[in-house]
Structures are given as C-alpha cells and as structure tokens.
Amino acid sequence: MRIALTGNPNSGKTTMYNALTGRNEKIGNWAGVTVDKKEYPVKKDHYDGSLELIAVDLPGAYSMSPFTSEESITSGYVKNEHPDAIINIVDATNLSRSLFFTTQLLELGVPVVVALNKSDINEKKGNKIDEKTLSEKLGCPVIKTTSTTDTGLREVVKKAAELQGAGQKPPYVQGDINLHDKKEVEAADRKRFEFVNAIVKQVETRKVLTKEKNAGDKIDAVLTNPVSGIITVSYTHLRAHETCA
C-alpha cells in the first residue's frame, strides 16, 4: 500500500517522512523536474498491521495546478500513479493557507487523512483548532501531529491504512475552468478561498496579538485574503504557465 505525503513547503512533511521511514532525507523543497520522488517502507515502530506500507515523499506545493516543477511532480503522481491514500500534512500555524491545497486533494477521489502538524507550536502561541469540527467540515479524518517528537504519527498512519479503498465525499468541487483565462482562474480561486476561510472561522481560535502580528500571520493574511490571495496565487500560476508554454 502506497501512502503519498503531501503538503505546503515548510509544513514538516519531509520531517514526518524521515520519522516514518527512518531515512535522513534533506529537509527542503525539491528543486527542478529531474528530481525523483522519495519512497521507503514505513517502520514497524509506527505501524504493526498486516499491510506493507510505502511512504512516498512528494514535493511541497501550494496547489494541484501543475504550473511549477514541484506542483507538476505532485499533481502528476497523485493523478497518474493513484496512491492508495494521502496523508496531507497541514501546518496548524498557517491553517487557512494550507487548507486551499487540502480541498483540492479531496476532489481527486483518493482517501485523505489530514495530519494537523506543528500542533505543539500552535498551542504554545495560544491558538486552538477544533479538529473534530474540522474533520466534519472536510469529510476526512484530522489528527494532531508533531513530527519532531513522533506525536500522533502511529495514529495518522493507522488511519491512512484503514482508509484504503474507502470513499470520501469532497466538501468542495470546483469543476472545469479555463486555466488560460485569468478572470476565470481568479473567480475560481476566490470561491475556494472564501469556502476555506468560512471553515477556518468555525474551527480556529487565535490569540489576539496586541502589539504586532508575527511574520507568519502577515503572510497568511495576504495569501488568504479573498482579493490579495487570488492575485498572489493566480498570478504566480499564470506567469509560470506562460513561461512553460
């Protein structure tokens, strides 16, 4: 059984892959289309069931749109190689930004488990995420994890193994759009961002910072704003597509 590990850059994805497999892969995003995917059996420390589990470390990506080399590798593997399950590593400290990608993965028909990673850091900041409600809204399991301490890894792997062959109803379906039409892409991204942000408002409680926002919050505010987020993500995708054309 092959389990694809997906997530935004710097979500802790490769740290989780190393923990699950005992490997020591370089932590960082893949560079260039010539780099092959990484895959290795999951250690018995994290799974003692009857299945042979192979973890596949895919490049960090913000979207399933294949406009960058990293996104192309990730999108191509999930769509063409048909992994048995996906562990989507979501950065708990940047929930809105991460869930844009999550909702795209849930449209593909492959069972998804969300690993709500860096939960320890998020809680130290005074923030809270209701993972039970988030699971209900997404229609998939959500498990808190901390890759650096192995917290939650056995649970997330066990759940992924249990989901083999299971069906999941996607919470959001975009439909076909013309990727060459900037206005159409922006409109589609706007709707997805609005859907994601509506979920986040229901499940996340953030500690109010009285003096200034930290750098991550500032970036998150730009990327998940219904207007600026569209400009940032869509423009980057379109420019990358034009360059490759």
Predicted regions located by residue number:
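Short, membrane-interfacial amphipathic segments enriched in basic
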Residues: V203-G216
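Loop-to-transmembrane-helix entry motif
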Residues: V222-P226, I230
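Canonical P-loop GTPase G-domain recognition
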Residues: E123-K169
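Conserved G1/Walker A P-loop phosphate-binding module
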Residues: M1-V56
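Conserved C-terminal guanine-recognition region of P-loop GTPase G domains, centered on the G4
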Residues: Y77-E81, A85-C140
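Single conserved hydrophobic/aromatic residue that forms the stacking wall/gate
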Residues: H237-A245
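Switch II (G3) loop of P-loop NTPases
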Residues: L53-P66
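Short, non-transmembrane cytosolic segments of multipass membrane proteins
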Residues: G167-V200
